[in-house]
Amino acid sequence: FFIVFFFKFYQTKDLKKLLLITFILIIGCYVYKNHDDFPYYHLTYSLNLSENSFIIGTGIFSHGFRTFSSLFYYHSLLYMPGINFYLFHLGPFLILVFFNISILLELRERFKSSSINFSYYFALLSFIIINVVFYRIVEHGTDRSAQILLILIFLQFFDILYFQKDRKQNLIKINLFLIMIFLASSMKAIYYLYILLVP
């Protein structure tokens, strides 16, 4: 997502705004503490993924090793030389930043084009609810990030179904919609029910 949106912002000369918002919000990464289960199994699972290339039979160690999540694989990508595992808790924060930037840009575009409709008010209400209810990164396990992405999925769904008339933009939104569905559903095993939204 970040690569796709990076190129989108780079083409529209909004890269400076993206970097400014990210820099301002990165302060939150130092303020918030980790999830309560982070030392229990988030850290050990992600560290095991980043340090070992062949993992089999680890489910006997603890409950956390039996519940896979794409968020843990994402955390293992944040393992960097010199920094080691100190950025593992950054994953949910980056998803929250991605949501805020996406919604703010969507609201700005709709306000400039004077296309204020149901989708605009749904995006505005979603922005308020997510930032009031989900602002505590300490509560973000594997489920909160998927719920944040689910709000974006519904926004894309309404735009595709009711408001998007341009065929090229519609195709881009459908691709983004499918990627977000599979990403949100892979964050927790029960969220595979989101795949029912695909047809």
Q: What is the role of each PLM region?
A:
Residues 1-11:
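Membrane-embedded, hydrophobic transmembrane alpha-helices
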Residues 91, 132-159:
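Multi-pass, polyprenyl lipid-linked donor-dependent membrane glycosyltransferases
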Residues 14-18, 112-123, 169-174:
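Membrane-interfacial loop-to-transmembrane alpha-helix junctions, especially the N-terminal start
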Residues 27-118, 137-139:
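Active-site lumenal/periplasmic loops and adjacent helix-entry segments of GT-C-fold
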Residues 1, 33, 81, 129, ...:
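Transmembrane helix irregularities
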Residues 14-37, 128-131:
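Transmembrane signal-anchor helices characteristic of membrane glycosylation enzymes that use polyprenol
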Residues 153-173:
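Membrane-interface transmembrane helices that cradle and orient dolichyl/undecaprenyl
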Residues 134, 172-199:
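Membrane-interface alpha helices of multi-pass inner-membrane proteins
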